[in-house]
């Protein structure tokens, strides 16, 4: 997604743009233009007709090495991002993001210690649409609008975990290189590098396999954190629910990616596997060992379907961690399985006691 203000000034000021970030939107991820290289890099010396392909490849490699791999370059890139997009310094929002990023970094570090070689830079920008992206140099930005759609940290963590999955696999740099290489192949026959810049700005170049890989990594990261793994499915249910009431937040849409429903259902399958094939959910009803357990009611701004995936996540975690060997019991209005909270009954739900008794008969 392009920034609304200063875009043409930005193009004139900078000699090149490499962008390969992805943004959480209903049904897909959308291109997020990343800030451009500083003019002193020397793109001006290679833009023009008749540039040899080998020279262009060398310049591209030099660009990526500086702005994706070097500490100096990626910090320079990050500062340019903040200038272009603007920074939201809201204390409460930034505190939440600091906590989520710290938790995700620890979770990722437990399975991929390379994260500590290039720690993520991140900031909240002022855009009011539903959006977050990771681009070159492990530089991330989160739209203010994300918080108007997602209100709990578990779902926000899924969004950011997906973006960090792209970063860990270097998808942004691979996407930028692929985009530019398609143009560079024709450089010796007259294609200008100026057209390459336009190609990078206007194309995502994040493949479906990359998207699926980032989705899978988000699940792995969440299951190595204290966040509810059911949030991986719940977030997509919420996006589908909110798209009906907040369509202006989801105007940018790309149709050549898996749908929200497909992503949700893929995560439900992962949760089934994570539970050692004991629990699943469909149409708002959670099943344990193939038998109906509960159909949660809507609560607050959360639909019953969205809420069901959080219950599913708690049950999956209980079975994964062996808490199912214990009897279900009640703590206040909360159904417990061992030391794992499963569901807190609201006024419109069945009583916690009744649910605990049912769970003990089918678990």
Language-model segments: which ranges?
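Short glycine/threonine-rich beta-strand-turn micro-motifs
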Residues: 327-346
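C-terminal partner/receptor-binding element of secreted or periplasmic proteins
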Residues: 349-363
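Solvent-exposed coil/turn segments that connect beta secondary-structure elements
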Residues: 102-103, 126-128, 137-139, 145-147, ...
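Residue-level signature of catalytic and energy-coupling elements of molecular machines
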Residues: 97, 142, 214, 259, ...
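Post-HEXXH active-site segment of zinc metalloproteases
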Residues: 171-200
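C-terminal segment of classical bacterial N-terminal signal peptides
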Residues: 24-35
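C-terminal capping/extension segments of zinc metalloprotease domains
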Residues: 5-7, 16, 20, 35-75, ...
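Peri-catalytic and regulatory segments of divalent metal-dependent proteins
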Residues: 40-180, 225, 245-248
